[in-house]
Amino acid sequence: MILLFLLYFSSSLWGQSRDVTEYVDSMIGNSDSRWMQFPGPAMPFGMVKLSPDNQGNVWRGGYEYKINQIIGFSHIHSWTMGGLLTMPVTGPLKIKPGEENEPDSGYRSRINHKNEKASLSYYSVLLDDYNIKAELTSTTRTGFQRYTFPKSDSSRILFDLENGSEYPYEVRWASISKVSDYEIEGFSTQSSYDEPTNLLNDYTVYFVARVDKPMKSFGTWVNGYVDTTSSICWGRHDIGAFMNFDTEEGEIIQLKTAISYVSIEQARKNLEVESGGFGWNFDAVRKYAVNEWRKILSTIEIEGGTEEDKRKFYTNLYRSPVGGIKIAHI
């Protein structure tokens, strides 16, 4: 009897003091949903919305829970807007994502949802085809990824500028260039079509990407042509780049990215201001993001209801500011 009382008392006390951020479940609603609803990390009105994708150019595209694959992690999940997909891989170079019914035809990877985790400002998954663990977090204008690689002399990070989204977009002109053994930069001028309004949405995504380990080599591709010696590429439509590495078993390579709709210089400033103070401390960035969310979520307190009711409420409260986008720059 005493034991039952203590169990009841402790569970009741825990329920009263539970952090509101723990109620957010970003995996809710990721089946047959919209491009703007995704499991990956995002800040309130974040410019960067870093999340896994596993579909091509289809209505309600993006991430579908029923598909046990990942194409990559793209940085933009706003209405009629997409772009800058990254993907850690090993083995022979593949520059196409491939098809769902033929996953070996491209760089996509199979996954098991048992090895997938999503919580506020955090997402992780094991990419089965490569035995790579990918972890994601973000600030308002930057992404932070932590990849745990197997032992391989063909480890790489892909950067694909034209990828599938709910509103298909065309890369009209783009460039990617190597700045140093640790950094690349580029831009992608894109055009997407919104059928209901019969309007074209034109915008340019500028980006900077930085790693914490020097790349062994760098290469690019444009419309199927691969150049393993180039330090810069220009083109339209299918364009991308890759960083090559040698890795030991369990070695971690971290990737920071920042975007801007103004200039490459502004993207680099976004990276320095929002992410520079954290160094390469992934967990510190994640903690900062959760604390920022706590300020918003804790403004509303609810009484009554079950734990499941609270989970649904705070998840929906979280989704509201995620849907918006902060275009203003630092």
Residue positions per predicted region:
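Accessory carbohydrate-recognition regions in carbohydrate-active enzymes
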Residues: 16-330
